[in-house]
From Swiss-Prot:
This is N-acetyllactosaminide alpha-1,3-galactosyltransferase. It comes from Rattus norvegicus (Rat). The chain crosses the membrane at residues 41-58. Residues 59-371 are lumenal. The gene is Ggta1. InterPro entries: Glyco_trans_6 (IPR005076), Nucleotide-diphossugar_trans (IPR029044). Dorsal root ganglia neurons (at protein level). Expressed in the heart, brain, spleen, kidney, lung and liver. Pfam families: Glyco_transf_6. It is a single-pass type II membrane protein.
Length: 371
């Protein structure tokens, strides 16, 4: 049996004590580290959860606010306190006229009497302080036969309560009739070159309108209508007709099928529309829109007219044929029912509730030099 010296025994004991203390300290440090890591994880989870909860509440609250804003906007629109443009279904109710076609395949409205909310539209456009232009051409004997009636009736019924500028194109401005205009209405008269044939007068108006839009009309009006002079207003032609690109259904063809329409059918013409194509037959006696849209329309139509002249061909219905070709590929954003340009020679069917404009008697033998 080996006897360990006392001082060595003390050293060994002290060494063991230090080792055990070091081991305990190491274990304690590890546990603290583990606790710290767990604490950080728990804290991170809590923070992420808090962020998610806050984000969820924000999204829902934002959505709620958006719904409230929409509802407030609707209420303001109903009360006339907003200048936000009314949406189609705010002012247009096609169900009021189930017996007629009221919406095109491309979802544009066809405006009939009873389908629109006049009061709502008037509130909006009155606050917009719009100006509407109206071009009309009167040459030769058309001046004495039609111009005065057209202007006097337009002054009474066209865009009542809004600023209007009548642009009158004449080949002899000295024959301009005296017309008393309403306070919000003004008149600009321009002299244009006389043409030998009425067909050329009809077609050249596209060029003339385009030139005047570029020169001054685009800076003067918000909307522009172009109309034939041989017709007369009979009732309000109001803001329900305004749109970016507005077309007029031709009274004689609004119930016909496209293959029956008198489109230009000769392939050589720029106005050619083949059988099996087409939507409606549009009347060149009334069309309108914003100045930029009318500028594009007149440019394209006149381009087609010039192309036909190069090929020594003339479209069947002149500028109207080219107008129909344009609308085939540039769909109108709004269409006016035949009530807005009606021919009483057809009679008065039950679906024609309120005639806005009526054709005048076509005395071609008196007003045209080459019938």
């Amino acid at each position: 049996m080996v006897t360990m010296p006392q001082d060595l025994h003390v050293k060994v004991s002290m060494s063991r004590s230090k080792s055990e203390t070091s081991l305990l300290s190491s274990r304690s440090g590890s546990q603290e580290k583990i606790m710290n890591v767990k604490g950080k994880i728990i804290l991170s989870v809590l923070m992420v959860s808090t962020v998610l909860v806050v984000f969820w509440e924000y999204v829902n609250r934002t959505h709620s606010y958006q719904e409230e804003d929409i509802e407030r906007a609707r209420e303001k629109g109903r009360n006339g306190d907003s200048i936000v443009e009314p949406q189609l279904w705010d002012w247009f109710n096609p169900k009021n006229r189930p017996e007629v076609l009221t919406v095109t395949p491309w979802k544009a409205p066809i405006v009939w009497e009873g389908t629109y909310d006049t009061a709502l539209l008037e509130k909006y456009y009155a606050r917009q302080k719009i100006t509407v232009g109206l071009t009309v051409f009167a040459v030769g004997k058309y001046i004495e036969h039609y111009l005065e009636d057209f202007l006097e009736s337009a002054n009474k019924y066209f865009m009542v309560g809004h600023r209007v500028i009548f642009y009158v194109m004449m080949d002899d401005t000295s024959r301009m009739p005296a017309v008393h205009l309403s306070p919000l209405h003004s008149l600009q008269v321009f002299e244009i070159r006389s043409e030998k044939r009425w067909q050329d007068i009809s077609m050249m108006r596209m060029k003339t309108i385009g030139e005047h839009i570029l020169d001054h009309i685009q800076h003067e009006v918000d909307f522009l209508f172009c109309m034939d002079v041989d017709q007369v207003f009979q009732d309000n032609f109001g803001v329900e007709t305004l749109g970016q690109l507005v077309a007029q259904l031709q009274a004689w063809w609004y119930k016909a099928s496209p293959d029956e329409f008198t489109y230009e059918r000769r392939e050589l013409s720029a106005a050619y529309i083949p059988f099996g194509e087409g939507d409606f037959y549009y009347h060149a006696a009334v069309f309108g829109g914003t100045p930029v849209h009318i500028l594009n329309l007149t440019r394209e139509c006149f381009k087609g007219i010039l192309q036909d002249k190069k090929h020594d061909i003339e479209a069947q219905w002149h500028d109207e044929s080219h107008l129909n070709k344009y609308f085939l590929f540039n769909k109108p954003t709004k269409i006016l029912s035949p009530e807005y340009c009606w021919d009483y020679h057809i009679g008065l069917p039950s679906d024609i509730k309120n005639v806005k404009i009526a054709w005048q008697t076509k005395e071609y033998n008196l007003v045209r030099s080459n019938v």
